[in-house]
Swiss-Prot record:
Keyword Transcription regulation listed: yes
Native source organism of the sequence: Photorhabdus laumondii subsp. laumondii (strain DSM 15139 / CIP 105565 / TT01)
Family under the similarity heading: Belongs to the HicB antitoxin family.
Function summary: Antitoxin component of a type II toxin-antitoxin (TA) system. Functions as an mRNA interferase antitoxin preventing effects of the HicA 2 toxin.
Name this protein carries in UniProt: Antitoxin HicB 2
Alphabetically ordered keywords of this record: DNA-binding, Repressor, Stress response, Toxin-antitoxin system, Transcription, Transcription regulation
Domain of life: Bacteria
Amino acid sequence: MSKNMRYPVKFEHDETGWAVMFPDIPEALTGGDTREEALAMAQDALVTAFDFYFEDRREIPTPSTKGEAFVEVPASIAAKVLLLNTMLQTRTSNAELARLLGTRPQEIQRIVSLSHSTKIDTIANALNALGKHLELVAI
């Protein structure tokens, strides 16, 4: 996944207002009376849609690079997306990752939950255990 996790949006307008859709994440839909209002609500819609992927243990698609506008994924969420996708790509269960980290499966369940705050070092350690390295870049 790219260093910047920014998902492109598509706008549609009719007499009822503006709709925002994410071509890469079709579950993420929102709208507003104005284009600006719809875009302001888009990040919440995107993160809410990610919850469905986490619950179903489905890989979250990589963002495409072309769009009218983009919505940035918060760093704390982006790190968890990277962890979930890595677990799925390596077919690593919560129990297996817990064994690799010397912790309980319940702790891994919290780590891969979007509703639970997790220290970035914890996510980095989990990715390291799966053979990946979490890299943060300021641009």
